[in-house]
Amino acid sequence: MANEGNLPQWVGNDPMMMEYMRDEWGRIAHGEQVVFERLCLELFQSGLSWLTILKKREAFRGAFAMFDPDVVATFGEADVDRLMSDARIVRNHRKINAVITNAHATLALRDAGGLDAIVWAYASEQPVELDGNGMLPTQSPESVALARDLKLKGFTFVGPTNMYALMCAIGVVNVREALGLV
């Protein structure tokens, strides 16, 4: 069942969330910095609602140098302390350190095609199948493989569920068609 604007009911009625779902979510997105930002935001979302992260997105961008992996990779303990005291973002030490670790891993991937190419290599031609309640799956064989591959390449805090969320968010998985949002 859809809400106003033909969005799935689970989107809710928050205007920011509805705009995000209409204009960004599931639309094809490429580029190292774009994919790195989305990976980091999905990492921060673990255990929280996406709306919480969405409302803090601009603060995250400011705090993490617009998610420029070259800059984030230079972050040290003083930066971690600064981030831990920034009430505008999610202040989780493990997640903040994971973003810095993942920035280093992103830089290391440049000689192997880059983060964008690795994530997009897991695109599937298989259509997304909704469950009996019209809900998306929480992971896929491709997201399991992507999480494993990224962990082997030095990434942390990347599991099958948040990698599936990343894949959906940037259009690697064609969720818009499955939900009738094309």
Region locations from a protein language model:
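HhH-family (HhH-GPD) DNA N-glycosylase catalytic core used in base-excision repair
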Residues: 1-182
